[in-house]
Amino acid sequence: MNSTNDFWLIDSNFVGVIRFYKDKDHSDKSIDYMFIEEGIIMGIHGENPPLMKTRKKVVIEEARLLWQKLLNEGWQKTNKKWWGNSTKTFFNFRN
């Protein structure tokens, strides 16, 4: 969805967001891993940074299965919803 190779989904209620992105620093170069970060939109119009709930590292095949499962459940592709690291994030609800 964008040039940084992270991919985003938003739930049908426009409350939950999930970011998928490749782990570029893992030690086992023979297996590709992805991070999956989940958060919720904060504020009535998303004016506050999202609240990060979870972050996990999975093999890329598991990430692909989860991506497809979520799309089948009604999640939608969306644009980037927060930037930076987990301690300083900014939210852009309009994208």
Predicted regions and their residues:
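Terminus-proximal functional modules
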Residues: M1-E73, K77-N95
